[in-house]
Curated annotation (Swiss-Prot):
Protein name as it appears in the record: Vacuolar fusion protein CCZ1
Membrane-topology annotation of the record: Peripheral membrane protein
Biological function: In complex with MON1, is required for multiple vacuole delivery pathways including the cytoplasm to vacuole transport (Cvt), autophagy, pexophagy and endocytosis. The MON1-CCZ1 complex acts at the fusion of vesicles with the vacuole, through its regulation of the SNARE complex during the coordinated priming and docking stages of fusion, and particularly at the stage of tethering/docking.
Region (Disordered): 503-529
Family matches, as Pfam families: Intu_longin_1, Intu_longin_3
Subunit structure, as described in the record: Forms a complex with MON1.
Amino acid sequence: MDFIAVYNPAVYAKEADSEAWRQLLLYHSFKEDAEEPTPQNEKLSLIGMIQGIWQFAHNFSEPETRGSVRYVDTQLERRRVIAVEVEDGHFMAFGVEDGKRYGCEYYVRELLQSYHVFRLHCGSMSEFADRGELTDRLNEHVVGYWQALKLVPEAIYASTLASVCWHDGYKVSELELRDRAWESYIKNEILLDSESFLGLKDMCIYKLPRDGRRSAAEYGLLRSFAPEFLSLPELSNWVYHLDRLFETALSSHVLAGHVRLSIGGDEQEEEGELRHDSQPASDVGARMWRNVTMPISMTYDTMSEVGNLTGINTLMSGLNSLTSGFSSMTSRLVRRADRQNSDTASLSLHVDHGFLISPLALEALPESYRYRRFQLRFSTDEPQWYRLLFWYYKDYLCIFIFHENFDKIWDPDYLQAIDAKLYDAMLQLEGSVVTEDNKPGRFAYGVFNKTTKRIECSLPLLRFSDKRSDEKSRQPLKMVVAGIDETLQFLTAGTFATNMATSRTNDEHMGPSATNTLRMPEPTDAPSSSWTLDITKLNLFQGLNENLRLEKMADTDSGTFLDSLSSEKLLQLNVELCRLYTGIRRSEYNKAGIQEEQLLRLNNGILFYISTSPTEDVLILKNWFMDDKYTKAENKRSTSASLLHSLGGDVRRWWNARTNREQ
């Protein structure tokens, strides 16, 4: 990476030559070995060249293409520069030296997503009256976004065709369910509840499978309830971005925005860093704290069996907010709403659900641990600011979107009631999931609805940690918690490990020389799914056991035929698919209102079906060699004029089922 810049040339047109620097809102160089900072004249000269190329390119563009993303991709001296218009008059430019191995779609997607992250947190650039404040916010969010990608550039390229070329859409989960009773329960008991009706704008529920490469078709947004949620793609892609970077370490720290990636060796640990074994840096202090709290914990367990002693429970709740990592003092939330006032409530020692971000967090923590403030847009209304709370159940992540002036979220009883109701809904959801032992599919698909922006995709999710595993020379990455003083780091050390563990692909001992896998380590005193704490703590989204990862990656009895490919082969395949699809899409401007089908054969023998229309794009990859001679004969006898039907009975059955489901 060379640089990232944000500029507004319209400002320069209004100012004298001596004020030309005002058009440059942000310029960040990634060249850490540079002896001197880039001179201001050199920055302005670069922006001037980019803008000149931009005007030359787009003055001759067809009017029909104006509705799409406007960008330029050019080579300037030693570097490749991609510039995108993110707002009217505001541009973002990115310089990189990649030998043009990857299509510009990869970088256009990241530029737009970094802008969308900025807009979620700060609003539109045009809303800023103070240039200095705008630059500060760009440094915080845009530079932070790209700095993380600089440490793990594999995250840019380890993306499917769907996420790269359909960056304005959002991935939906295709989890197969027997019924939708859980949806009705959420609507009636939470959304339409008298206490929530005026304040709760929407709920978004995501399925984020934690099993190895994950089931690609099941990954994504399972349900949102508000009609015409126009910011849903930006919010969903923000969640997916955090998940791809931090993977199984998606926690309260990450969602609150207080974690940054850092390259770590065997040198002295950085300030704010926690050890990968979930132990604080001071082992003596940790043992002392355990000795102090253990008698209180045992007393609490005994008294809980007697009954619901309100005064004592209130006191112990305060102690619970200070101690973390002890199963006897955590997970104290009654799971069902009708048990809240029961004198004989059975309290579980392990609760696999709870709030990640909510006002129930420690008061000493920063505000972002109690709620996230995002600017979102619903229907045709102007964007407004909302408060977001985060809740999880196993590998489901739920986002509550509240109006900013709704003060009920500060009521602990209200939040605990929501927690109990949503837990009941998740039990209903889990009971309705259809579990079948499917054989590997002979085809993979991607469908993009241009009206709703929904993406259905079964292309394997390529994890960049797989690609890093062959690069033993790379230094391990650490996750550093920032913005929390040493006392809180100590008190919350049991909830979050900042060192990404390292492991080999065989049974050798784990150590610093092992290959990197970006995952959270498994605690030795808890089951593989128990990285959870009570809602008064800093919660960690359900983790992943390394043995499960290796087993799932080697298992080809589910998913599609592409799951058996290596990460390097998947990467090459996605780059080629992006190149082919982009070339076809660029010629759409003169084919308005026409549906076009194409069937291509790749060099590896895979058939690539592409259908483009004004409302929907459909992509299908088919392994023709997996069809037996009877299936091929059946395909030849097909009388349909559609190329899709010539791909085989399995593709036809999937397409017909999908069509019937949408009707």
